[in-house]
Every structure is written in structure tokens, then in C-alpha cells.
């Protein structure tokens, strides 16, 4: 079986890049002859070496998308299946299907709501992606893979996709990379931290909800004054706004790491006492899954796909959406109860092993491929 996987850009530190890298590696291990086509490849998906699709005239977004689609049409041939991810990859799959008759499967990760962005260009980008995907979903797709039940619901309700066309294949976790590590707490010396730690890993985009964690911090410090809050990841979008308007009283308890080497992330998960993920929208929730693989309890909001990944009262504590007081209460409860932290952490690890391995994701993806080709 020969499969062409298409995503226009493989971003560094992107959940979708992780998805493609982990999935293609395991599909290759199962005998699939797989190639990844991308216009730009900043992220690492080794051992797979992406095929960079080069073309001239890549200034305007529309020109880039059209050029990428046309060039892929000349390069993707003699494949049994084309598997696309995101926008504008979905158009490539439709084009190749029309041009060469190659069946097309599309994995839908979802788009963060327009209201979740403050940057006007990001709002326009999400509108463009959502509308484009809506029309593309009805113009030449054999199967759609949803990464969660929540995403399947979006596909049937808002994108009007026939339920019979949809298969759910959950994302996975690299269980060999993310697991409990002895001596990991030594990493806090680098940041001058000595005491309980609450960790967030991710971007600073508004919909990721860091502002709700910031609001929760004073409430936590009233009860657990020695707690440190580590914000690990990118600083794009609203960091300056957050720092000026909300951080003055709690600056002493905050540590911003910025982007980190990949090898440090598993140590951070293992070293923290509580992982907090206050995101206001998730199609799956990869970082909470990684934290649970490292046997750490999670505090998050009870909406979107998060309840599919974090079980309230068993592997973490889920608060009402946008309820910073509920977020604080969950963090405090875990910081004050070490037995609960250990129990939830171990249950989280077991659940990740049972339901969310990349090997299982690869097997289920292979089942979808076979259904299409039968």
C-alpha cells in the first residue's frame, strides 16, 4: 500500500506535526510505503523525510495555496491513497482525486473558534479555513477521520458530513517519551524553583486560556503561598497584554520559560505536581494526554474534547468552562492532597496506555485505509 500524506506546512512544536510524525512512523513500521508532502518543513518528523514541494510565486496566500495544489498534482502519482491534513491540504486531496482517481481521506483536527482570537488576521484566517473546509468536505472525499467524538459532532452538525463517512481515530501519546522520570525535579533548579509547582505547556494564543490560569493564581496563593506556576512554551500573541494588565500582584510566583528544547518537555511534566490546561477549545488535548502519560493529575475545563481525554474525579479535576475559581479550587485540592495526586497520576498513565497509544492510532488508521481500498 502506497500512501501520500499532505500538509502544507510542518510547523515546529505543532500538535499536527507530532500527529503526522508519530502516525507515519508507525504506519511505515506496518508495511505502508508512505511519503509526506509539504511546502515547508520546520518541524521534525524523523525518520520520515518529507518531500518539499517547491514552486515559484509564493507571495500571496491564495497563490501559495493554488501553487501548492498544482505542484502536488504533478508529484503525487502511483499512490493507492492520499491522506490530507488541515487547510489547504484538503484541496490537494480533492484535486489529486479528480486528476488521477486516487481515493482521498482527510483527517479533521478542527479549528479554534473565531471568537478565540484577538488578532484580526487570525480571525480572517479561521473564517477562510472553516468556509474552505466546508465546501471541500462535499467535493471529493472518500472518508473523514475525526480525532475525537467532539470533532465528529462538529462534522455532522456544522459541516453537514454524512456520519457514515466519518471514522474516529484518537490521537496518541508517545508513551516511551512521556512517562514518569526519576530525578526530574532537578530541572527546577535551573529556574530557582523550590516548592510545589503547577505547569502549563502550550502557546499563549487567547483561546488557550492562560488568562484564566492567571486569574486563578491569586486564589491559589492565598491557600498555598509557596506555589510556583511555570508557563512553558511560545510567547506569541497576548503575552505583553497579559503581563501588563494581570500579572503585577503575582509576578513573584510566575516563571515563563519560552520555547524549550524537545528533550526538556518530558522532564517538566514529570517534575510538576499539577498540570493545568485551561484551554477554551481543543479538538483533542495532546498536552493533557502527555501529562497523564507522565503520571501527573490534570486540572482543566469540562468542555470540547477534554472530557474524552481527562476523566473528572479519576485522572484529573474538570471545572466549568471559563470558571477561574473552579480552576483554582481544583489546583488547591490537588496541591493539598498528595495521595490524590499520586492516585490520579497512576490512573491517568494506565488510561493513556490502554486507549491513547500511537500504535493503536496507527492500527485504526490502517483499518480506515483498508475500508476505502476494499
Residue ranges and their predicted role:
Residues 280:
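Aromatic "clamp/platform" in nucleotide-sugar-dependent glycosyltransferases that forms part
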Residues 312-313, 317-324, 333-339:
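Conserved acidic donor-binding segment of nucleotide-sugar-dependent glycosyltransferases
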Amino acid at each position: 500500500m502506497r500512501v501520500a500524506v499532505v500538509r502544507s506546512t510542518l510547523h515546529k512544536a505543532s500538535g499536527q506535526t507530532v500527529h503526522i510524525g508519530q502516525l507515519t512512523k508507525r504506519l511505515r513500521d506496518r508495511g505502508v510505503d508512505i511519503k509526506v508532502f509539504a511546502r515547508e518543513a520546520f518541524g521534525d518528523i524523523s525518520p520520515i523525510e518529507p518531500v518539499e514541494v517547491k514552486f515559484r510565486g509564493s507571495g500571496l496566500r491564495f497563490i501559495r495555496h493554488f501553487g501548492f495544489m498544482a505542484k502536488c498534482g504533478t508529484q503525487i502519482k502511483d499512490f493507492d491513497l492520499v491522506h490530507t491534513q488541515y487547510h489547504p491540504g484538503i484541496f490537494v486531496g480533492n484535486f489529486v482525486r479528480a486528476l488521477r482517481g486516487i481515493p482521498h481521506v482527510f483527517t479533521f483536527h478542527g479549528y479554534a473558534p473565531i471568537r478565540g482570537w484577538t488578532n484580526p488576521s487570525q480571525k480572517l484566517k479561521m473564517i477562510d479555513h472553516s468556509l474552505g473546509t466546508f465546501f471541500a468536505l462535499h467535493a471529493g472525499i472518500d472518508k473523514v477521520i475525526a480525532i475525537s467524538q467532539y470533532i465528529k459532532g462538529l462534522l455532522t452538525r456544522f459541516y453537514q458530513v454524512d456520519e457514515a463517512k466519518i471514522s474516529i481515530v484518537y490521537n496518541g501519546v508517545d508513551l516511551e517519551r512521556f512517562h514518569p522520570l526519576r530525578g526530574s525535579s532537578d530541572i527546577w533548579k535551573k529556574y530557582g524553583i523550590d516548592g510545589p509547582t503547577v505547569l502549563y505547556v502550550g502557546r499563549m494564543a487567547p483561546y488557550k486560556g492562560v488568562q484564566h490560569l492567571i486569574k486563578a493564581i491569586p486564589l491559589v496563593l492565598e491557600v498555598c503561598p509557596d506555589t510556583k506556576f511555570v508557563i512553558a512554551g511560545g510567547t506569541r500573541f497576548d503575552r505583553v497584554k497579559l503581563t501588563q494588565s494581570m500579572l503585577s500582584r503575582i509576578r513573584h510566583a510566575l516563571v515563563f520559560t519560552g520555547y524549550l528544547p524537545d528533550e526538556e518537555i518530558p522532564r517538566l511534566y514529570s517534575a510538576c505536581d499539577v498540570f493545568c490546561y485551561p484551554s477554551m477549545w481543543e479538538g483533542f488535548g495532546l498536552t493533557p494526554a502527555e501529562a497523564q502519560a507522565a503520571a501527573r493529575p490534570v486540572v482543566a475545563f469540562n468542555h470540547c474534547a477534554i472530557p474524552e481525554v481527562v476523566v473528572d474525579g479519576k485522572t484529573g479535576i474538570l471545572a466549568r468552562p471559563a470558571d477561574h475559581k473552579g480552576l483554582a479550587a481544583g489546583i488547591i485540592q490537588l496541591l493539598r492532597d498528595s495521595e490524590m495526586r499520586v492516585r490520579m497520576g497512576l490512573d491517568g498513565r494506565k488510561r493513556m496506555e490502554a486507549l491513547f497509544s500511537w500504535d493503536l492510532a496507527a492500527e485504526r488508521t490502517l483499518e480506515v485505509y483498508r475500508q476505502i481500498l476494499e
